[in-house]
Amino acid sequence: MAVKEVHGPGPRGARGPRPKVENPGKLLKRIMDEVFRNYLPHCILVLVCIVVSALANVQASLFLQTLMDDYIVPMTRQQNPSFTPLAGALVRMCCIYLVGILAAWANARIMVNVTQGTLRNLRTKLFTHMESLPIRYFDTHPHGDIMSVYTNDVDTLRQMLSQSIPQLVSSVITIVSVFFSMCMLSWQLTIVTMLMVALMLFCSKQIAKSSSKYFIQQQRDLGKVNGYIEEMMEGQKVVKVFTHEQQTLAGFRELNDQLKESAKQANSFSNIMMPVNAQLGNISYAICALTGAAMAVGGVGSMTLGTVVAFLSLNKGFNMPISQVSMQANSVIMALAGAERIFKMMDEPSEIDEGYVTLVNAKYDRNDQLVETAERTGLWAWKHPHHDGTTTYHKLAGDITFTDVDFGYVPEKTVLHDINLYGRPGQKIAFVGSTGAGKTTITNLINRFYDIQDGKIRYDGINIHKIKKADLRRSLGIVLQDTHLFTGTVMENIRYGRLEATDEECIAAARLANADGFIKRLPEGYNTMLTGDGANLSQGQRQLLAIARAAVADPPVLILDEATSSIDTRTEALVQRGMDGLMYGRTSFVIAHRLSTVRNADCIVVLEQGRIIERGSHDELIAKKGKYYQLYTGNLTEN
């Protein structure tokens, strides 16, 4: 269900042809499937209420004929008329209206429950699926645009489910029942009415055709505006540092103007629909009134005053749902545009995981054999099921090997070439090199954020493609280049590394990372609330918490992606002491800005344009006087 849209060269937001929804019928069916899956009985009850309400309104209009011909007109010919029969008739008419009102009230109440429940389920499915998407998706889609799917696009469905669809169903039932009722009263006046209805439908179709493309573009432009706002909020410090407030505002105005134009065009067309249909309805009403009166006075057929009054009431009740159908059509078009974006995200392929080797708690039995256990022992093993039905267990050691690995973020552009390296348990492997050399890319391959095109990566001798991704990542401690902290207490952020960790284990991890000192100086210590990605902490403090979070997971392999790149010298010394203790006995892959932080690495791997050009210890590489020597003696940094 792709949306056809072509962007040519030009400034931000330059547009090609206007997009249009493909397969609207398929989209609508998919939306209704979401509703019926959990609320089919409710929808049947809503349909019953709509039918009762529509028939009550029709019956009330037909009752006007009886009221006029059998009660009011005869009373005008009596000198002392009795109002008792008329009062009884009015009571019956009020009862009919009351039934219609109660049915409409029940319909509205039930639809609120159906709509909100469906949207809750849809948001849950959307979020669940989002969690299964590969990192590649988030690297290639603006986060604000993704947020717009949850907010604006889902809200268009709320309007459609709670208002448009019930109104459309009610209008169709009303139109059908009123049509047959009008035919029973006067086929001549029915023909007059239908001629005006044909004109109303023609006008509505032309207006809807003109506005639909703008409603779709409006949703797109709204997503762009949300994406831009979120991006600028995240980068507000950078904007202010470089004093780019005016340029940022200019960019926002450009996107905001695009949104204004598409919204103006969409609503300009849709807003004239109701007045046009209302005036055509009034013309139809006037023509029927004049024609009916002439027929009644001329004694044509069985036309009476009551028939004319009843028919005019039905005429009004017929034209109104026609106008409502036209108006709700625009709401449905907007909702379909939002639904297309929702389902497009839900149809994104989930992260592929064909692994079958899992990570389990283990212990040694009496025969000194590794066996699986439900209790946490601190000893982990790879559980490897085989085709013959047997299962073997291998102790988790932390041995990582790359063999002839090639990789590109896009197939036609390889960024890593023939990578061969290994990290033995307890070794510290450091990556250095210029910007874009491939250092971070290698770490992304270890945790399978991306998968290689050629070669093999083995973990404890097991091809990592055979290991379930969740278990693979559970065995890795990762400190990312951009530290992210969640809204919550300091303790909760540390515990994120292992949710079942006790407070004592979290505090021990903080001490290991040398974070305990500054945490205790916070207003509430470990219970201090962090908001806005830990904006009330320094960059160094945030990275210390990230290291503590990795430490509490107690992994055999560490990936430190430029963990100390933004820390001052004093804080770096604290971190380095903590990290030396954390890395002891663990395989560690480290990327750092300062080459001084990797001097004690067991092996330093020098990368250039995706290839390993040097490897060895610090002293060995200095003696070679190659690229590493140039970086080190020239006081250059890798990034």
Tell me what each language-model feature is.
Residues 1-57, 72-93, 107-111, 115, ...:
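Membrane-integrated ABC transporters
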Residues 29, 48, 103, 107, ...:
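Hydrophobic alpha-helical transmembrane segments of ABC transporter permease domains
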Residues 10-19, 116, 124-148, 152-154, ...:
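Short intracellular "coupling" helices and adjacent cytoplasmic loop segments at the cytosolic face
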Residues 38, 42-55, 96, 163-217, ...:
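Transmembrane helices of ABC transporter permease
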Residues 74, 181-195, 265, 269-340, ...:
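Helix-loop-helix
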Residues 17-25, 49, 56-72, 87, ...:
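Juxtamembrane helix-loop junctions of ABC transporter transmembrane domains
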Residues 79, 362-639:
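ABC-type nucleotide-binding domain
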Residues 37-40, 135-136, 154-161, 165, ...:
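An intracellular "coupling" helix at the cytosolic face of ABC transporter transmembrane type-1 domains
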